Swiss-Prot record:
NCBIfam families: YloV (TIGR03599)
Protein name: Protein YloV
Gene encoding the protein: yloV
Species name: Bacillus subtilis (strain 168)
GO molecular function: glycerone kinase activity
Organism superkingdom: Bacteria
Effect of inactivating the gene: No visible growth phenotype.
Coiled-coil parts of chain: none
Gene3D superfamilies associated with the record: 1.25.40.340
SUPFAM superfamilies: DhaL-like
Length: 553
């Protein structure tokens, strides 16, 4: 179908098709993540980000492409999750800004908008890396600019853009050695290609295949957490204290999935069980006393791609407290000079952050990146003139920076990439000092700590010069896999032996749901025997998937 001009309605249809196609392929994009850890989430993050943009567009009823573009940009900005989601939002922010005054655009203007998006995205990334989504977007836009000098058909232009995006994606391993080593193309670039393929299908009048959408667990379990119902019971009456939700990407080669057996086996761990499944995914909601048992069982069937655990006793106490307050308007708490927003996964880690001064802890991290809007809401809830944000994950830093750019408060993003870095930064904070001095001290603190993790591999791969088998426990030091073992305790010993230097004085061990206090104490005994001068601190972090998070400083 030949299209000479693009109006708002046609562009809106393209956006919805692009979002749908990305959703269809999110699992395939996740599978391209370089690290074989159980939290590969590029596809998930891009899907959630694009879906947020598409929802804003769905609310529009206009032929004005500038207004549709602005809606897309707004939705993407606030819904962006992870570095890939933020870059996607910046690509379409630049695109939308370029067309914001136009009611419709031609092929040349469409190409110029693609290029404006690339320019905006490159500016948003402090150190752009080629062989990523940025390269794919840049090459596709360059192709569009060249072709648009003669081509007036937007469908033909989009065809060329999509073909060049795919060719550029296939070249990414030549630009980024780690992709070549692992044998994959860039996951973010693949996600962008999925969006472009959806755009093209829409322009051609083709329908993007729709898969059945699993019902929302939030909708299905809302009655379980209704505040009025909770206010009628006593906290001590809650037998199973942790609301546990997990999404499993089913792997039939791992264990054949039978929903009845799956449901029956899970029922032994708690009550209020709900299981929703299709051919590729299973969603679980259960109230359990030991959430780790649920996660361990679910892992037998495939990769855990989303986890949420909430302490219902703590929530219930909070609800009772809130509902017992007078209904009349009370004076809000006085505004504070400083506030600290941090991100953490695991009840124990969250409690640690609160105990050393965090104002708000956003639930999230390795397995669930918070959106820009989540971080914005947290900053506003602090009610402080100046807020420090500790992302504690390299994949959350860009969303934190994006949140900082849209709030009125003075915000400092301390680029902590790990939980230990975040804790060191928070301990360096002094409320009696000026904001800039605190920023300097916190930035210095994150440079002084070495961070390590122990988790398991979700697939066979070759990375960092090592052959890794599915199920192996990996020791990861400052982002590099240093070795593997068949059991998590041995992996932790290997990791700490590599990590600890002669100048280190304190080792902190945060053991997760897959480890135990007894095992952590064995690790402590190992360290005490090998390093007599080292002080060892052990905490139950209760984090999922990562058996140990450790630090040395």
């Amino acid at each position: 179908m030949s299209i000479r001009t693009l109006d708002g309605r046609t562009f809106a249809e393209m956006i919805l098709a692009g979002a749908q196609n990305l959703s269809q392929n999110a699992s395939a994009v996740d599978a391209l993540n370089v690290f074989p850890v159980p939290d590969g989430d590029t596809g998930t993050n891009m899907n959630l980000s694009m879906t947020s943009g598409a929802r804003e567009v769905e609310q529009m009823d206009t032929d004005d492409i500038g207004k549709v573009g602005s809606a897309l940009s707004k939705g993407l900005l606030m819904g962006a999750r992870g570095n890939s989601g933020v870059i996607l939002s910046q690509l379409f922010r630049g695109f939308s800004k370029n067309i914001e005054t136009k009611k419709e655009i031609n092929a040349l203007e469409f190409a110029a908008a693609l290029q404006a998006g690339v320019d905006m995205a490159y500016k948003a990334v402090m150190k752009p890396v080629e062989g990523t989504i940025l390269t794919v977007a840049k090459d596709a836009a360059k192709k569009a600019m060249i072709l648009a000098e003669k081509e007036t058909d937007i469908t033909a232009l989009m065809t060329a853009v999509t073909e060049e995006a795919e060719a550029s994606l296939n070249r990414t391993p030549e630009l980024l050695p780690v992709l070549k080593e692992v044998g994959v193309v860039d996951s973010g670039g693949k996600g962008l290609l999925c969006v472009y393929e959806g755009f093209l299908a829409s322009l051609k009048g083709e329908t993007v295949p729709q898969k059945a959408v699993l019902p929302s667990l939030d909708d299905m379990v809302s009655a379980e957490h209704h505040k009025s119902a909770q206010s009628m019971m006593n906290t001590e009456d809650i037998e199973f204290g942790f609301c546990t939700e997990v999404m499993v990407r089913l792997d039939q080669t791992k264990r054949e999935f039978d929903e009845g057996t799956f449901r029956q086996d899970l029922s032994q761990f708690g009550d209020s069980l709900l299981v929703i499944a299709d051919e590729s995914l299973a969603k679980v909601h259960i109230h359990a006393e030991e959430p780790g048992n649920v996660l361990n069982y679910a892992q037998h069937y495939g990769e855990l791609i989303k986890i949420k655990i909430e302490n219902m006793r703590e929530q219930h106490t909070s609800i009772i407290s809130q509902e017992s307050k007078p209904a009349d308007n009370e004076t809000p708490p006085a505004k504070q000079p400083y506030g600290i927003v941090t991100v953490a996964m695991g009840e124990g880690i969250a409690d640690l952050f609160k105990s050393i001064g965090a104002s708000v802890v956003i639930e999230g991290g390795q397995t669930m990146n918070p959106s820009t809007e989540d971080i914005v809401d947290a900053v506003k809830s602090v009610n402080a003139d100046t807020v420090f944000i500790l992302p504690n994950n390299s994949n959350i830093i860009m969303a934190a920076n994006q949140a900082a750019s849209v709030v009125d408060e003075q915000v400092f993003v301390i680029p902590a990439k790990t939980v230990p870095q975040g804790m060191s930064a928070l301990l360096a904070f002094n409320p009696d000092q000026e904001a800039e001095a605190n920023e300097a001290n916190m930035l210095s603190a994150i440079q002084q700590v070495k961070s390590g993790q122990v988790t398991f591999s979700v697939r066979d791969t070759h990375i960092d010069g090592k052959d890794i088998k599915k199920g192996d426990f990996m020791g990861i030091l400052n982002g590099t896999i240093i070795g593997t073992s068949e059991n998590q305790l041995s992996a932790a010993k290997m990791l700490l032996s590599e990590m600890i230097g002669e100048d280190d004085e304190i080792v902190t061990i945060l053991y997760g749901e897959d480890a135990s206090q007894e095992e952590a104490e064995q690790l402590e005994a190992f360290l005490s025997e090998k390093y007599e001068e080292i002080e060892v601190e052990i905490h139950n972090g209760k984090q999922p998937l990562y058996s140990y998070i450790v630090s040395a400083e």
